[in-house]
A protein has these predicted regions:
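Glycine-rich, small-residue loops and helix-cap segments
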Residues: 31, 42-125
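Flexible, acidic loop-helix segments that line cofactor/substrate-binding pockets
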Residues: 1-6, 29-42
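A general alpha-helix detector
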Residues: 16-17, 35
Length: 125
């Protein structure tokens, strides 16, 4: 599920920035530029397949809400990443997927989420 959400996210990011990227690539930081570059590589057939899987998954989430009003779960399994960690995640797919394991399903389905802080690191993050 996280892989589907990630592929859709990068493709949608590339589409959103299509008028200014890559012509103004230098104005983008390395993290966002990397996401857009990855999004530009997602082909049309893959996007269609992802759309069908997204619709099927969204229907399952809708069905879950037929028997309950709320799903409680963690948002992240570790502290928020630093900018250096984010930059590393551009090339480390496993690290990216681990960070989004809990939120990706709802990014994919489009259901609303509320995230509440549950602590902080020594750096205050």
């Amino acid at each position: 599920m996280a892989t589907d959400a990630l592929q859709l996210c990068v493709a949608e990011t590339a589409y959103t920035h299509r008028e200014t990227y890559p012509s103004r690539r230098d104005a983008y930081g390395p993290v966002l530029a990397g996401l857009i570059d990855n999004g530009r590589k997602v082909d049309a057939t893959t996007l269609i397949e992802l759309g069908y899987r997204r619709a099927a998954f969204t229907a399952k989430i809708h069905a879950m809400f037929g028997s309950g009003d709320l799903i409680l779960m963690p948002a992240m399994n570790r502290a928020a990443p630093t900018l250096d960690e984010l930059a590393r995640q551009i090339t480390n797919l496993d690290e990216r997927l681990a960070r989004m394991a809990f939120t990706a399903p709802f990014d994919l389905s489009g259901h609303p989420c509320l995230t509440l802080p549950g602590g902080a690191t020594e750096a205050g993050v």
